[in-house]
Each structure stands twice: as structure tokens, then as C-alpha cells.
Regions:
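Acyltransferase donor/substrate-recognition loop-hinge adjacent to the catalytic core
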Residues: 1-23, 28, 148-207
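Conserved donor-binding loop and adjoining core beta-sheet/short helix segment
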Residues: 12-17, 46-118
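A structural signal for short, well-ordered beta-strand segments and their strand-loop junctions
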Residues: 63, 72-75, 128-136, 163, ...
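Extracellular structured ligand-interaction cores
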Residues: 59, 95, 129-131, 159-161, ...
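Short, solvent-exposed loop/turn segments at secondary-structure junctions
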Residues: 77-81, 95, 137-142, 169, ...
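Short, basic/aromatic recognition patches
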Residues: 31-54
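Non-catalytic accessory segments adjacent to catalytic cores
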Residues: 111-158
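Hydrophobic, Leu/Ile/Phe/Ala-enriched alpha-helical segments that form helix-helix packing faces
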Residues: 29-32, 48-49, 120-127
Length: 207
């Protein structure tokens, strides 16, 4: 794909050593000083890329290096929306912020984050994207990354993500909900057909 080569050429101009080594990616997740989310999991990224495969999705995720050492990760992909316009995101909608190893100097982190923002601008220019959405992943506060973005943002708004640990049984999941929600959950059990699928396919989400 011609556009894919162009996008990676832009990426390598900023991060010539970047790759997507599975073990290094996992190591960053284990040693991060940030609240890593499900959106930072490599399998989640692969899922979204697969889900949007009919929309020309391209996995642009990166391991970030400093002095030849892996110090951070950046989930990122490009795909076309229903209007055939390109979108940059980490989950089909929003750009997920990078996370870094513990004890990385603030000066180094800020330098890498600046490069990422400039990279996003250049990728957006190549893809003729006029607007991107960003998400804050910190609990009860804004991350430094997101605070910097607020200074540049044209518009801000609040959204909420409800995340569920699907490794638990349905009964265990129910126990973790607040009591006031349980009547609604029980109603859902009565009215919906609820199943657990170990091998999930794209077609199941399209039905």
C-alpha cells in the first residue's frame, strides 16, 4: 500500500529505531509509571486494526527509544471512516497517549512527547485530517501530556469508558457492580442473550 509506505517514512524521520517488538512492549507495560489502559495492550491494538480492516486500517503503533533503549510505547493506527476520510486513533475514535518507563527523566519524556505531537501533525497533514480526538487516561487528574494538549485544543469535552475484566465469570463481574445498578443488570439478564466467547471473530461484532 503506497500510503502505508509514506506514513512509515514520516514515522522513521522522527523515530528511526522504532519497532513493535512484543517482549519490549510488554516490558514497558510492566514498568510504566502511568495508568496503562486496555488500549495499550498489543492484543487490543491488533483487535482494532483487524476490526477496521475493511476500512484500510494501518497499524502505526511504536516502541519509543532513547539512546537505543526502549523507554515508551505509543498505540496508534489509521483507518477510513464511513465518509472515506482518514482517522488517526488508538481505538477507532481517540488517540491514546503514550506511556513511559518509570524513572524516565521529565526532560527526556517531554522531548519525546513533543516529537510525537509533531509526528501526529505531519501524519494528519499527509492524510488530510483536520481534527483529532485525544483521551486522558489518568484517574482523577490530567496527565502532563493531556495538559499540553488542552493548551492547543480547539474544543474539550468529557466522555466516560466503562471497562470490564472479562477474565472473570459473569457472576464475579456482577458482584463488583454497585447495589443500585443491580436491578438494571438483572433486567439485562432477563431481556438479553448473554454469552461468553473464548474465540471472538470480527463477524460476531458485525451481526
Amino acid at each position: 500500500m503506497k500510503i502505508k509506505k509514506k506514513l512509515f517514512k514520516i514515522i522513521y524521520n522522527y523515530f528511526p529505531d522504532t519497532d513493535i517488538d512484543i517482549n519490549k512492549w510488554k516490558d514497558i507495560l510492566k514498568t510504566s509509571n502511568s495508568n496503562s489502559s486496555t488500549f495499550h495492550l498489543l492484543n487490543t491494538i491488533k483487535y482494532y486494526v483487524s476490526y477496521f480492516s475493511d476500512n484500510d486500517s494501518i497499524n502505526l503503533s511504536m516502541i519509543l527509544y532513547y539512546d537505543k533503549q526502549a523507554v515508551g510505547i505509543m498505540p496508534l493506527m489509521a483507518h477510513k471512516n464511513k465518509n472515506k476520510e482518514w482517522v488517526l486513533s488508538g481505538n477507532g475514535v481517540e488517540i491514546i497517549e503514550p506511556i513511559f518507563k518509570k524513572n524516565l527523566a521529565d526532560k527526556v519524556r517531554k522531548k519525546i512527547e513533543t516529537k510525537i505531537l509533531n509526528l501526529i501533525f505531519d501524519l494528519s497533514k499527509e492524510l488530510k485530517i483536520n481534527k483529532c480526538q485525544f483521551i486522558n487516561i489518568e484517574f482523577f487528574k490530567f496527565s502532563k501530556w493531556y495538559t499540553r494538549l488542552l493548551e492547543l485544543a480547539e474544543e474539550t469535552f468529557t466522555s466516560h469508558h466503562l471497562l470490564v475484566d472479562l477474565s472473570l465469570s459473569i457472576e464475579e463481574i456482577r458482584l463488583q457492580f454497585r447495589k443500585s445498578y443491580k436491578p438494571l443488570i438483572n433486567k439485562g439478564f432477563r431481556e438479553w442473550k448473554i454469552e461468553v466467547h473464548e474465540q471472538v471473530t470480527k463477524e460476531q461484532f458485525d451481526n
